Amino acid sequence: MSQLRWWVVSQLLLLIVVCILDHSEGARVCPKIVPGLDKLRVGVDITKLDLLPLFDLGDNGFRSAVADYTCDRGQTTVVDGESFDVPDQVDSVVIESSGQQTSSVTTIKSESQISQALSISAGISVDTAKAGFSSSASYAEMQEAITKYGRTVSQMSAVYTTCSANLSPNLLLGQNPLQTLSRLPSDFTADTEGYYDFIKTYGTHYFNKGKLGGMFLFTSETDMSYFQNKNSQQVEANIKATFASILSTETGGSSDQSKEVIEFKESSLITAKFFGGRTNLAADGLTKWQPTIAKLPYFMSGTLSTISSLIADTTKRASMELAVKNYLLKAKVANLDRLTYIRLNSWTVGHNELRDLSAQLQNLKKKTIFSDEDEKLLQSIEDQVSVPAWFSDRTTFCFRSTAVGSADQCNGQSTSTLCAEPNRYTQQYMDKTYLGDTGCRLVWKLSTTESSDWFKSVKVNFRWYPTWSPCACGPVGTPFTISAPANSWTQDYLDVTNPKFGECMLQWMIEVPPTATLWAKNLEFCIDFTCGKKKQCVDANHWTEPYLDISAHEACGMSWALIAK
């Protein structure tokens, strides 16, 4: 009975296709479409989408057409003095001639922020973004820059919009994808390869809205050391100045030779690219390049819809949605496999566990359909090797000093609190206890607004002992240790080191419990002190080398950092 039902359904589908083909034969073909609108009717593989690629070579994620354009209505519009056809399937077209619009600075400090940043221009939801872009060349480049080399990626652009368009909400699948779909069974599990071939040909999504024009894109990968002793406003101002300098240089203008721009360039790997128009004319100036954009526009951004939403057959639509879900999971496996390989070559703790995870990923690579247990396994692997957003975006390491007497001894303030996100040093605390005898009370804290349960057992540890005088910080040679769990300040340490009271040895450690995930066990704690040019990083659960706090006759700059590798 089921075979008979399937035969009847398949014949009906073929009849529908034939009817559509017969109808389309009489449709007026669009002889000259508005430049750039072809991109709105093609499919997109969300896992490989690379709208603004850092490299010219590679797959940009665009696929074959999912809709057919016809021009029965005869609608036209003028672009740069020339008439062009507006397809019936395009709901609205707005021809623009805006001047340069400069974007704000986008900063990507963690892997969790890569998809989020790339999704902004593509106009997709956060849930889809988690699996999106991970197979693109730009994603892989940013991932390596952040996770392998500890760099921060920043982007900024100058945009010249020439056209924006929306597809009709009543868009229908085109002849070719409809024919391909008609040959597929209603059940995804009956022909998984057939459904995957459809996705490989037509993609997972299409743009129902788009913005076209020209763009100059600036991307920098900046060493962590650059951000030391600079606040976010200073960093952003320097990025903007460097962007403006490079845009000026690329378009035949002069270069900014200020020390801020030079310093940023020396600390960064910079990529600058033009999109749209005759890019070979850009070096002759914006006045040469900009007029060529309207007829040679680039698809800069848009809003995505799923191709499955165009499938009229509810059963096949559900099967296509299931196929896309599994296709995205396959991309997630590939991404985690790449990330695990990076971890094996950069982490110092947990190599045996990483090899086990890698073996599990090799088995998952063979899957065509993922079970609920497979999804749980994937999530558990991700939890081990990927630094979560709650840590990279919402966690801080803080230091606070409180003057007991004169504020001159303690950073020049009665109370000073200095905090930094992971992979950033705190701003310098200037230790000047040699200026008095009352000293400064010092405390440290690791804070987060959300976390896994095990993180509550992570501790900040600090210990000290005097070298020759018990007046400085207690009995000579006897170490004192204070510690505090996450979201709590340590007890006060009274710093009265000076030539009168003596010197103290200081050490710090981040203590991570055995129940923690692998990424946390590979955290590093770093110190950078100007006195003695003391700069070092140690793994979690290890003390820093002793630092001799002399506080004799000069101020000592002190900074701390928590590094997620």
Swiss-Prot record:
From the UniProt record, list the coiled-coil ranges. none
Top-rank taxon: Eukaryota
- Its signal peptide is 1-26
Alphabetical list of InterPro entries matching this protein: MACPF, MACPF_CS, Perforin-1_pore-forming
Q: How is it modified after translation?
A: Glycosylated. Contains four O-linked and one N-linked oligosaccharide bonds. The protein contains 2.5% of carbohydrates (high levels of mannose, galactose, and NAcGlucosamine, and small amounts of NacGalactosamine). PV2 is a very high density lipoprotein (VHDL). It contains 3.75% of lipids. The major lipid classes are free sterols and phospholipids and also have significant quantities of energy-providing triacylglycerides and free fatty acids.
PROSITE patterns (UniProt xref): MACPF_1, MACPF_2
Q: Name one GO molecular function term.
A: toxin activity
Q: Enumerate the spans annotated as MACPF domain.
A: 27-340
Q: Its principal location?
A: secreted
Q: Which GO terms describe its biological process?
A: defense response to virus
Record-level GO cellular component terms: extracellular region; membrane; other organism cell membrane
Q: Where in the cell is it found?
A: Secreted; Target cell membrane
Keywords from the named record: Disulfide bond, Enterotoxin, Glycoprotein, Hemagglutinin, Lipoprotein, Membrane, Neurotoxin, Secreted, Signal, Storage protein, Target cell membrane, Target membrane, Toxin
Tissue note = Produced by albumen secretory cells. Found in developing eggs.
**Pfam families hit by this protein:** MACPF
The record's function comment reads: The egg defensive protein perivitellin-2 is a pore-forming two-subunit glycoprotein that affects both the nervous and digestive systems of mammals. In addition, it is a source of both structural and energetic molecules during embryonic development. The tachylectin subunit (31 kDa) binds target membranes while the MACPF subunit (67 kDa) disrupts lipid bilayers forming large pores altering the plasma membrance conductance. Both in vivo and in vitro, the protein shows wide pH range stability and is resistant to enzymatic proteolysis from gastrointestinal environments.
Q: Extract the PANTHER family matched here.
A: PERFORIN-1
Query: What is annotated about its quaternary structure and interactions?
Result: Perivitellin-2 is a heterooctamer of 4 identical 98 kDa heterodimers, each composed of one 31 kDa and one 67 kDa subunits. The 98 kDa heterodimer subunits are held together by disulfide bridges while the heterodimers are assembled into the native perivitellin-2 octamer by non-covalent forces.
Name by which UniProt lists this protein: Perivitellin-2 67 kDa subunit
